[in-house]
Amino acid sequence: MIRSMRTAARAGCLQARAELRIAFLTPTFFGMLLGPCFLVFFANLERHKQIANTISGSAYALVGLLGSIGLLGAFQIMSEMFNERNDGSLLRTRTLPRGTESWMFGKLLSVSAVTGITLILGMAAGFFLFPDLQSASLADFLVLAASLVFSFVAFLPIGVALGSLVRSTWGFLISMMAIYMIFLGAGTLSPVSVFPKPLQWLTASTPIYWGAHAARSAV
C-alpha cells in the first residue's frame, strides 16, 4: 500500500511539473500576472479611506484579499475538475491504479504553486505601493505566510467538493459568480461594520472572513 501511494505521489509530482512548465514557460504566464494586478487594482480603489484613522484603506484591503486568496485556489481546483471532466482527462485517470489520487495530488501542487506566486507578486507590489505595509517586520510577514497557508488548506476541500458537484456550464458560471462575490464582499475590501447587523453575522460565520482577519492581524 505504501509503495502504491509513493507511486501515486511520484506521478502527481510529474503531472504538477508538466503543468507548471506550461504555466511559467509559455505566454500563459502573462495571463497569470492578471491575478496580482487585479488584487492591487481593487486594493487601490480603497486608497482614499482610513481604517481606525491609522491604516490606509488600500493596505487594509490588499492584506484582506491576500488572506482570502485560498478561495481563488479553491475556484481553480473546481475549474480544473470541471474542464478535465468534460474533455475526458479525469475519466481516463480513473482507469489507472490510484489515478485519481495522483491527479488530485498533482493538481494541489500546481495550484498551490500558482497561488503562491500570486501571493508573492501581490504582496511585493503592495509593499512598494502602500507605505503602511513597509513598517511590517520579517516576523510579521512570516506570520502572514503561515496564516495564508492555513487559509489555503481550509479552502481546498471546498474547491474539491464544488468540482465534484458542478456538472453543467450554468452551474459553473453560477458558482464562479458566487465565489467572486464572496471573495470581494466578505469583509476583505472593507470592514464588515458597514453592513447591516444580520449581514455582519452572516459574513463573520464564513471562513473567508476569518482568513482575511487572520492575515490583517499578522501585519
Tell me what each language-model feature is:
Residues 2, 28, 59, 70-75, ...:
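Short alpha-helical transmembrane interface motifs in multi-pass membrane proteins
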Residues 22-49, 58-76, 116-118, 175-184:
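Hydrophobic alpha-helical transmembrane segments of multi-pass membrane transport/permease proteins
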Residues 100, 104-183:
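Alpha-helical transmembrane segments and their short interhelical loops
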